[in-house]
A protein has these predicted regions:
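Cytosolic, long alpha-helical scaffolding segments
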Residues: 2-242
Length: 242
């Protein structure tokens, strides 16, 4: 009886270890796709940051190329989101926190959509409006702050499979960047309201800076999701080692 009990216990432990290893493998595959997704979003953000200067310089060819690049990247991000949805569906209940992974993929997809929307609205604002109170420089700085935030997300996900603790530290840095973005956003809002008299132009510019701030909020949501993934991976590694 004791021998049978020990054998059953041994088999149960092996099954738990095997299931745990499979889950970690499935999660690593999902994280690799998320990393691919965030890389593309980072590239789109960098292209977006060049747009204000091109608009001021009336670089029509450059603007056209930038808008095409951003639209193409958004499509790539959507395809990656569909891929991760299929992959997570295929493994079924193997990944315990699959909802978190899917939500992260969809939120990153939204960030890609924000970049496309901002680029479109920005390209339809008059040059004279963008030059108001040096808004072109302020816009570039605001977008670059969000690009810094996305870059941090890229660093976080790169460290997820290597050092979960490092991921959590990096996630805290995104919060500081978000606070800087909020401060810059408030200052720019006052500048826009005081400096732009044309109603249509005012609404367009206000929409642009609000969308940039909302995009930063979405980046913070992704950062929070990465913390949950980091904690999950750390916990699973502890179980497998035991």
């Amino acid at each position: 009886m004791k021998a049978w009990y020990k054998l059953e216990k041994h088999h149960s432990q092996l099954f738990i270890m095997y299931s745990g290893e499979l889950e970690v493998q499935a999660k690593r595959k999902a994280i690799a796709i998320l990393q691919d997704e965030i890389n593309r979003i980072l590239n789109a953000g960098r292209v977006l940051s060049t747009l204000p200067k091109m608009l001021v310089n009336k670089d029509k060819a450059g603007i056209k190329v930038a808008l095409e690049q951003i639209a193409s990247i958004e499509e790539e991000v959507e395809n990656l989101r569909r891929k991760i949805t299929r992959d997570v569906a295929d493994v079924g209940g193997l990944i315990l926190n699959r909802e978190n992974i899917l939500n992260t993929a969809y939120t990153m997809d939204e960030i890609g959509g924000y970049i496309t929307g901002i680029a479109f609205k920005l390209s339809n604002i008059k040059v004279s409006t963008i030059k108001t109170s040096h808004l072109d420089k302020d816009l570039t700085e605001l977008i670059e702050l969000v690009v810094d935030q996305i870059y941090k997300l890229n660093e976080i996900i790169r460290s997820l499979n290597v050092d979960s603790g490092k991921s959590i530290e990096l996630a805290q840095e995104t919060q500081k960047i978000e606070r800087d973005i909020d401060t810059k956003y408030r200052i720019m809002t006052i500048t826009v309201l005081n400096g732009i008299t044309d109603t249509k132009e005012l609404l367009l510019m206000k929409d642009v800076i609000e969308a940039i701030e909302e995009m930063a909020d979405k980046c913070q949501e992704v950062s929070d999701s990465f913390i949950l993934l980091a904690l999950s991976l750390w916990f699973e590694r502890r179980i497998i080692r035991k």
